[in-house]
Amino acid sequence: MTQLTHFDTAGQAHMVDVGDKASTHRVAVATGTITMQPATFTLVRDGSAKKGDVIGIARVAAIMATKRTADLIPLCHPIGLTKVAVEFALDEATATVACTVRTETRGQTGVEMEALTGVQVALLTIYDMCKAVDRGMVIGNVKLLEKHGGKSGDWVAAG
């Protein structure tokens, strides 16, 4: 099993030194869902929620969150992102909105945390904008789908 990298030999947390790592093109893709009542889904789909364009605001929130990840996750390196793409898929049959965030950089460390943070904040934004009509929404299935680049190479989730 690989050793945890964020702890020194005394068990103290530290930020990993990436100074000697090569700068490479790095990509990460993460996803997650929020499930809601059908009436809430209709408001989101039709853009008629009281607070405005839920999907549009969630997209901007995701992009903003990716850029602030190092401020939220204590041992995460600040990264100069070169691209952030946010996509939403609406499934009327299950009243579910899926969010997928793709992050890219050319740097010394990966962008997985940025993609995951973007997804979470997008889904939290949807919850915030719709909670007045549906407090029972469920956020779930948040996961990394793939990462590319760096010393550890490529990884794609099974399934």
Curated annotation (Swiss-Prot):
The active site is at 128. It catalyses: (8S)-3',8-cyclo-7,8-dihydroguanosine 5'-triphosphate = cyclic pyranopterin phosphate + diphosphate. It holds the Pfam family MoaC. Belongs to the MoaC family. Keywords: Lyase, Molybdenum cofactor biosynthesis. Its EC number is 4.6.1.17. This is Cyclic pyranopterin monophosphate synthase. GO terms for molecular function: cyclic pyranopterin monophosphate synthase activity. Catalyzes the conversion of (8S)-3',8-cyclo-7,8-dihydroguanosine 5'-triphosphate to cyclic pyranopterin monophosphate (cPMP). It comes from Cupriavidus necator (strain ATCC 17699 / DSM 428 / KCTC 22496 / NCIMB 10442 / H16 / Stanier 337). Pathway: Cofactor biosynthesis; molybdopterin biosynthesis. PANTHER family: MOLYBDOPTERIN COFACTOR SYNTHESIS PROTEIN A. GO terms for biological process: Mo-molybdopterin cofactor biosynthetic process. InterPro entries: MoaC (IPR023045), MoaC_bact/euk (IPR047594), MoaC_sf (IPR036522), MoCo_biosynth_MoaA/MoaC (IPR050105), Mopterin_CF_biosynth-C_dom (IPR002820). HAMAP family: MoaC_B (MF_01224_B). The keyword Transport does not apply. Substrate binds at residues 75-77, 113-114. It comes from the Bacteria. The keyword Lyase applies. Homohexamer; trimer of dimers.
